[in-house]
Design a protein with these regions (language model features):
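N-terminal interaction/assembly modules
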Residues: 1-108
Length: 108
């Protein structure tokens, strides 16, 4: 019998939660849970924070003129920024996997 999914244990859900707290709740205390993918989670969270301005610039160059990133849903902003970070700075992971997993994480 398969164990049920616990969305709080899925790495990209954890990444989204941490970054949402950092960007929108001004959560300065970034602690990372014990997890088998802890290094990956920390890399993506810290990398997205460090490169936030570059990621935002990149996104804004691809948005239509009537779309402003800061006017989009906050959760959507975080998901897109995480995905863009991975697509640009984690080339070992297939883009199909990155997109699929962030789409799955957005369903939780």
């Amino acid at each position: 019998m398969r164990t049920p999914y616990n969305p709080n244990q899925i790495p990209r859900v954890i990444i989204i939660q941490k970054l949402y707290g950092k960007f929108f709740n001004e959560d300065e205390n970034l602690t990372f849970p014990k997890h088998r993918f802890k290094k990956f989670i920390k890399d993506v969270v810290n990398g997205t924070i460090e490169r936030n301005d570059l990621i935002t610039e990149e996104l804004e160059t691809h948005l239509k003129e009537d779309l402003i990133l800061t006017r989009l849903d906050k959760l959507f902003q975080v998901i897109v920024k995480c995905a863009v970070f991975e697509l640009l700075y984690k080339p070992k992971t297939s883009s199909k996997i990155i997109i699929k997993e962030y789409l799955n994480a957005s369903n939780f």
